[in-house]
Amino acid sequence: MDLVTYQTIKVRFQASVCYITFHRPEANNTINDTLIEECLQVLNQCETSTVTVVVLEGLPEVFCFGADFQEIYQEMKRGRKQASSQEPLYDLWMKLQTGPYVTISHVRGKVNAGGLGFVSATDIAIADQTASFSLSELLFGLYPACVLPFLIRRIGRQKAHYMTLMTKPISVQEASEWGLIDAFDAESDVLLRKHLLRLRRLNKKGIAHYKQFMSSLDHQVSRAKATALTANQDMFSDPQNQMGIIRYVETGQFPWEDQ
């Protein structure tokens, strides 16, 4: 593998395992266009290499906290009224779900909003005991249109519905009971190594054929794509929602709080 320097992620290869670490400590590990582009670049490289396992990791305190409101705010202040399409992010999650490698989310700390898209899209999700999971979008008049097809596929409609409406974090224990997390332990690094000991034995061709077969059994995510992208763009282009985001970034106040 060629040595490449990235702005938003750290990447390392260890035999047949690729580790992608979200690394935006200055932005609470939120998602921006560069992070999406860089992750797609690495996954494309993994597809044509000997990589059989891709591990996603974050910072110790936050795995991924969703959309970068600061970046969205800057776009709005520059006069951009129409929100950009989230198709690259949706495609990234679909690659994690269907690509010819086993994908693992190794979660420590907080996961919010779009961060749940990563967790839901991966084949396996493990965590330590500090992990928590939330969907905060409705607090801003939004909803997780692009996350929901992946989350519903993972934990079912009602639990995803409940998480969306309540907007509050669930613990790693609840996440495990709901099937969002497959395994958790205080020593999640050890837990990850145990998983990799088994997964390293799988060959790439077998993984690719199996994941193609699994994808053929359920077309929910691909069918929902156009509807989810349209809904997301409409929400982020709505003037009232934009004002709520601007106010939150400038003052730290939520939409329901008094001026």
UniProtKB/Swiss-Prot annotation:
One of its GO terms (biological process) is antibiotic biosynthetic process. Changing D68A: Reduces the enzymatic activity. Signal peptide: none annotated. It holds the Pfam family ECH_1. One of its GO terms (molecular function) is lyase activity. One of its GO terms (cellular component) is cytoplasm. Keywords: Antibiotic biosynthesis, Cytoplasm, Lyase. InterPro entries: ClpP/crotonase-like_dom_sf, Enoyl-CoA_hyd/isom_CS, Enoyl-CoA_hydra/iso, Enoyl-CoA_Hydratase/Isomerase. Coiled coil: none annotated. It comes from the Bacteria. PROSITE patterns: ENOYL_COA_HYDRATASE (PS00166). Pathway: Antibiotic biosynthesis; bacillaene biosynthesis. Its EC number is 4.2.1.-. The active site is at D68, E137. Transmembrane segments: none annotated. It is found in: Cytoplasm. It is an enzyme of class 4 (lyase). Involved in some intermediate steps for the synthesis of the antibiotic polyketide bacillaene which is involved in secondary metabolism. Catalyzes the dehydration of the (S)-3-hydroxy-3-methylglutaryl group tethered to PksL to a 3-methylglutaconyl moiety. NCBIfam families: PRK07112.1. Belongs to the enoyl-CoA hydratase/isomerase family. This is Bacillaene synthase dehydratase PksH. It comes from Bacillus subtilis (strain 168). The gene is pksH.
